[in-house]
């Protein structure tokens, strides 16, 4: 149960933060956001704000989404013959079109729609008590959809495709950008929880209680200058020295040279065997000044991003489904993190957030990266691609993503449960 809750919480935070990036910059760019949803499926709460956005909470706590006017399949489901109820404003214009049996207005006019245009000419035409009538529709009118969600209509001037090219570009980039920001913030939290940022550039190390070095009397902080015949100048050189000195050995002992007050002291220690790796019981020292901790959030996030990009490069040149993890693998990893405490959960949250940010920047049309490429092409050509071409390109990207997701999920299931 804890694993399920951790998965829902981590995935939910990451997706909502990602979608909020799109939401915020869409509004700044003059694009109408018709709905900002937390969760998926049937809605359990809805409120339409003064900004025209419907804020909803939906029953399945799995992420969320934004509906931008003119973006993707955001359309109003009204067809010829659709029965609706019209609520009129004092000036005679339609201010609400009700497609559901919910939010009924006793003063509303029943109409069977024969024609409408909510984007350009802003009118609705149909039969009212067997008589054909035409009404002007207010620019900020709302539509109550079949499930009771009330959203604003989307005239052309507030649609995605009519925003400036830079407005569209930053709107598409803002989702991944927010994932990177979330990663930095979570790493800050971790660094402050741990009392500082790891200092891997020095040979001054923290000696862990009950570790191999502590058992031979090495103090809590020690400067290790040599292991065997290998010089130690930083954390990486210490790891390499231990690996070299213990390679192909059973129950090895190590001669460790420690500098104390200008003089060297040598101790002989038996490292702890941990699944074939030999541990001295040391950790990097920490920098606890505010500036180091502040910068540490950025550097830790950057190091994580570089590792992910390196793995992605290897995956491109050496394709292997076993190197990919889908929802099942993420659930397994979140369950493992939950068993090991809050710090592991936070680290997992930061890493997955950065991972998703990078993944979304891959130039596949269904992803934010693909949309950014289309924005760049539009900027170069000084005109957008034809709508039909953009639709087909996006559809191809969706097909690729669906096939990849099915393959990865199937591979996850086979790897985790049948091997």
Swiss-Prot record:
InterPro entries: PDZ_sf, Pept_M50_Zn, Peptidase_M50
Pfam assignment, any one: Peptidase_M50
Cofactor: Zn(2+)
One term under GO cellular component: plasma membrane
This protein's name: Putative zinc metalloprotease SP_0263
Entry keyword annotation includes Manganese: no
Residues engaged in binding Zn(2+): 18, 22
The family this protein is said to belong to: Belongs to the peptidase M50B family.
Cystine connections: none
UniProt key word Protease: yes
Annotated active site: 19
Protein's organism: Streptococcus pneumoniae serotype 4 (strain ATCC BAA-334 / TIGR4)
Chain ranges passing through the membrane: 169-191, 345-367, 388-410
Membrane topology: Multi-pass membrane protein
Principal subcellular localisation of the protein: membrane
EC numbers, comma separated: 3.4.24.-
One GO MF term attached to the UniProt entry: metal ion binding
Alphabetic keyword roster: Cell membrane, Hydrolase, Membrane, Metal-binding, Metalloprotease, Protease, Transmembrane, Transmembrane helix, Zinc
Localization (cell): Cell membrane
């Amino acid at each position: 149960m804890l694993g399920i809750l951790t998965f829902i919480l981590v995935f939910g935070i990451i997706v909502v933060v990602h979608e909020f990036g799109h939401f915020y910059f869409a509004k700044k760019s003059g694009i109408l956001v018709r709905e900002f949803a937390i969760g998926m499926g049937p809605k359990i709460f809805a409120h339409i704000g003064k900004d025209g956005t419907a804020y909803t909470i939906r029953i399945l706590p799995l992420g969320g989404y934004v509906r931008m006017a003119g973006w993707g399949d955001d359309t109003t489901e009204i067809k010829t013959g659709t029965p609706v109820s019209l609520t009129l404003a004092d000036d005679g214009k339609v201010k609400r079109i009700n497609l559901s049996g919910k939010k009924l207005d006793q003063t509303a006019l029943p109409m069977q729609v024969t024609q409408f245009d909510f984007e350009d000419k802003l009118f609705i035409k149909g039969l009212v008590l067997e008589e054909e009538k035409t009404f002007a529709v207010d620019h900020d009118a709302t539509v109550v959809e079949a499930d009771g969600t009330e959203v604003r209509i989307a005239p052309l001037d507030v649609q995605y495709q009519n925003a400036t090219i830079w407005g569209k570009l930053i709107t598409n980039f803002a989702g991944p950008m927010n994932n990177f920001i979330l990663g930095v913030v979570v790493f800050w939290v971790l660094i402050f929880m741990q009392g500082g940022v790891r200092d891997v550039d020095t040979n001054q190390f923290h000696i862990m209680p009950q570790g191999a070095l502590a058992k031979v009397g090495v103090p809590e902080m020690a400067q290790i200058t040599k292991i065997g015949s290998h010089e130690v100048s930083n954390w990486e050189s210490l790891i390499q020295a231990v690996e070299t000195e213990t390679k192909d050995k059973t129950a090895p002992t190590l001669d460790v040279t420690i500098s104390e007050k200008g003089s060297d002291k040598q101790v002989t220690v038996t490292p702890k065997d941990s699944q074939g790796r030999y541990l001295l019981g040391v950790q990097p020292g920490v920098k606890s000044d505010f500036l180091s901790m502040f910068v540490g959030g950025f550097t830790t996030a950057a190091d994580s991003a570089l590792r992910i990009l390196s793995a992605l490069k290897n995956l491109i040149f050496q394709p292997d489904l076993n190197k990919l993890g889908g929802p099942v693998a993420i659930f397994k990893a979140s369950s493992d993190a939950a068993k090991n405490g809050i710090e592991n959960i936070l680290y997992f949250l930061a890493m997955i957030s950065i991972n998703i940010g990078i993944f979304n920047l891959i130039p596949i049309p269904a992803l934010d990266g693909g949309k950014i490429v289309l924005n760049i092409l539009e900027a170069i050509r000084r005109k957008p691609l034809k709508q039909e071409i953009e639709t087909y390109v996006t559809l191809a990207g969706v097909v690729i993503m669906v096939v990849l997701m099915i393959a990865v999920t199937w591979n996850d299931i086979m790897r985790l449960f049948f091997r």
